[in-house]
Amino acid sequence: MAYLNVDEITSALQNLAAAYPATTELITCPHPTHEGRQTQVLRIGTRPASEVDGVLLLGGVHAREWVPPDALVLLAADLLEAHGKSKGLRYGEQRFSATDVQEILARLNLFVFACVNPDGRRHSQAGDPLWRKNRRQNNGGGDCVGVDLNRNFDFLWDHLARFAADSGVRTTADPCDKFTYRGPAAASEPETRNVVWVLDTYPRIRWHVDVHSAVPVILHSWGSDRNQTLDPGQNFLASAFDPVRGRPNDNAYREYITEDDLDLVTGLAGRMGEAVRAVRGDDYPVEQAYGLYPTSGASDDYAYSRHFANPAQGKVYGFTIECGHSFQPTWAEAEDVIREVGAGLTALCAAVTRLSPEPGQVPSPAAVSGTSPTSRRAPGEAETLA
């Protein structure tokens, strides 16, 4: 088997929707890409999107990272098959019971956005394998092409104004930069706007995971500066801190997060890491996103920031999984990485089935603690091997 191309990803999602009409909905995003492609999201769950909380899973934001779209397509197929056959799932030594699978689909909606950036993936697979961005023409048909979609979201997007000059924030306003051009405006790109549209259209989404590669790590907010839980006034909305935001090794500014939220996201990230490790022993450490380097315009921080910028919006907890050790591993290696992603994301979903807050209410971190998903497996329950 080989990596799925853009058309095969689309066909796979459509085929799953046709095969499991009672537990899926195929959602067409409103904004065509620069090359005219229409992207789709597969909603998985037994209850309407308005009744239960949702988990948004993104893949393929960066074109050269070939594993994440395949991993999300295969996770969707695994969950739907296991649910339909009343079986559990096994990824290496990580097991989930049939009860786990049934509860995930009954108590959550999963929004599988397997390939956010199809133009970029097509270009990468057509002979420019390290291509990262989308395919916007930045200079009227010249050779300055593409926006880094994970620098284009409306979170501290204007890094020149919102970060210290010596912060080292990993983005650029140079439209000819090959890797991290932020775009001409926040959410300028149709691919970015499609993600925003999903969050706007389905306000019960509470969890957001952007799957990337290739440094094995599980990241949580914030990516703008080190976290702190004591001073709410130090936050991304406070322009007074723009001259010092993101500066390394100083205490002039740190990004505020509530203690409950910090406990919650580190606990859930830890759950994902434990499940990944059980697949084949590979370690995905948990880290605050800023620990890699300061960023602006990232999808996970944008998702989490929405509630702070507008308290009427429900809180969405953002994560990034960086999977595997290379952008395009051999297929044999990719299969193991796909199992790791499947294990981590299923563990997250199993954990958050115990967290069903009303819109705008913060779930208790204590609900994340307790027995692992495997402990609910009844003797003799069947498994589907992934």
Where are these regions (language model features)?
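Short, solvent-exposed loop/turn and secondary-structure capping segments
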Residues: 52-53, 67-70, 122-128, 160-162, ...
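Glycine-rich, aromatic-flanked loop segments that form ligand/cofactor-binding clefts
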Residues: 102, 108, 113-151
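Divalent metal-coordination and catalytic microenvironments
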Residues: 36, 60, 112, 149, ...
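Metallocarboxypeptidase
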Residues: 142, 153-369
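Short helix-loop-beta-strand segments that form the rim/entrance of peptidase-like active sites
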Residues: 68-124
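Loop/turn elements at helix/coil->beta-strand transitions in domains of secreted/extracellular proteins
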Residues: 21-24, 37-39, 52-54, 106-111, ...
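Short beta-strand-to-loop junctions in surface cap/lid or active-site-entrance loops
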Residues: 41-50
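Short glycine- and acidic-rich boundary segments immediately preceding or forming the N-terminal edge
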Residues: 1-39
